[in-house]
């Protein structure tokens, strides 16, 4: 069974379950609120508190469409994401405060620039969000930094999971945790499919397997996941469910976060004593890792593709100056990111392509090519 170190904690094997309190974007752009989230995570007994680092212009193209808020208001997706960026100057104060509170600071990184910024702080690990699982250039880049990597799998097919795992391993990084996850906020318990956890453990014995839970109940799915072998548990939390940000309503409040931590520790103690409890069929679901009916929409919205970042003229070579791996939002999807290195190796456009457009094969293949239908 696999194991590795995150700071002073062993993750995997017979070590205690590693509990990540996911603060995410629930700081709402307020540093004091970020400190309060760290306080809540430490007081609950979580091993780590995790934030998210991203840059809007490295996540979406400039016009990905509109997003309807809980209040029914249509807002620009790009502007919304831009407003949720965590300022770079926060990183060191948050890291120092986590040290003071004796909780490990972690962060998701969604682009190479954010990875560089986090790497400059000698991080304990990198987290890769579900919607970057197919961003193979990012996975390669982070893998080469030689830190433990945790990646989530919401909305993924098993082939996506395998390609991500294989990509990281190919760079010589074997410190990998794979998190089962469901791409719905909140996630209905009947879509938990916790049987995927032992399946992943069997399919990827060199990885540590965990569960990133988006359901609303503090203990039901997390404790069941631990009974099925999950070695990491991650769950969103907030200081107040009534705050207006996108991720507050389904997140745990501080009391519920402590309830989850206590529930997981109790479950671990029972397992050590040989006390077994059945996991409900509702939570077990299927062991087949696939994009479920409730995940298709967000997969189409958020899984990465190759997009132009500037107008490209016929005959112009593709490069990092005119294409990038981005989320489509409401735009038509571009080619899979696995083709990014191919495109930037001297391939030229066979027609004019506007900015902020998904690259398709017709942009590359000549009409008289034997590969063109």
From Swiss-Prot:
Disulfide bonds: none annotated. The gene is spsE. This is Spore coat polysaccharide biosynthesis protein SpsE. One of its GO terms (biological process) is carbohydrate biosynthetic process. Residues 305-367 form the AFP-like domain. Pathway: Spore coat biogenesis; spore coat polysaccharide biosynthesis. Gene3D superfamilies: Aldolase class I, Antifreeze-like/N-acetylneuraminic acid synthase C-terminal domain. It comes from the Bacteria. PROSITE patterns: AFP_LIKE. InterPro entries: AFP_Neu5c_C, AFP_Neu5c_C_sf, Aldolase_TIM, Neu5Ac_N, Nonulosonic_Acid_Synth, SAF. Pfam families: NeuB, SAF. GO terms for molecular function: N-acylneuraminate-9-phosphate synthase activity. Transmembrane segments: none annotated.
């Amino acid at each position: 069974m696999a194991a590795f170190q995150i700071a002073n904690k062993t993750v995997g094997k017979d070590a205690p379950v590693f509990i990540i309190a996911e603060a995410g974007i629930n700081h709402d752009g307020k540093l004091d609120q970020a400190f309060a989230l760290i306080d809540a995570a430490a007081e609950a007994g979580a091993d780590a508190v995790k934030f998210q680092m991203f840059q809007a212009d490295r996540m979406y193209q400039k016009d990905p469409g509109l997003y309807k808020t809980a209040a029914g208001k249509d807002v620009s997706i790009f502007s919304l994401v831009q407003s949720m960026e965590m300022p770079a100057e926060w990183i060191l104060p948050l890291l120092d405060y986590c040290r003071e509170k004796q909780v490990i600071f972690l962060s998701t990184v969604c682009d190479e620039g954010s990875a560089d910024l986090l790497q400059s702080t000698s991080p304990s690990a990198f987290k890769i969000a579900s919607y970057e699982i197919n961003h193979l250039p990012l996975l390669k880049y982070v893998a080469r930094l030689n830190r433990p990597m945790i990646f989530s799998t919401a909305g993924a097919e098993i082939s996506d999971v395998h390609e991500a795992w294989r990509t990281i391993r190919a760079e010589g990084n074997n410190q990998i945790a794979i998190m089962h996850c469901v791409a719905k906020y909140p996630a209905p318990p009947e879509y938990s499919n916790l049987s995927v956890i032992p399946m992943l453990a069997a399919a990827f014995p060199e990885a540590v397997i965990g569960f990133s839970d988006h359901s609303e109940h503090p203990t039901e799915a997390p404790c069941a996941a631990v009974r099925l072998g999950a070695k990491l548990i991650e769950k969103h939390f907030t200081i107040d469910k009534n705050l207006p940000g996108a991720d507050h309503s389904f997140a745990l409040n501080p009391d519920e976060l402590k309830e989850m931590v206590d529930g997981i520790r109790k479950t671990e103690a029972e397992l050590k004593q040989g006390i077994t409890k059945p996991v409900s069929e509702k939570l077990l679901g299927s062991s087949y890792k696939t994009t479920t009916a409730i995940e298709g929409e967000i997969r189409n919205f958020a899984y990465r593709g190759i997009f132009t970042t500037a107008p490209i003229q016929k005959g112009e070579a593709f490069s990092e100056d005119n294409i990038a791996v981005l989320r489509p939002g409401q735009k038509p999807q571009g080619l899979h990111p696995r083709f990014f290195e191919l495109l930037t190796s001297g391939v030229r456009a066979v027609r004019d392509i506007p900015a902020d457009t998904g690259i398709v094969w017709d942009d590359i293949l000549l009409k008289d090519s034997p590969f063109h239908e």
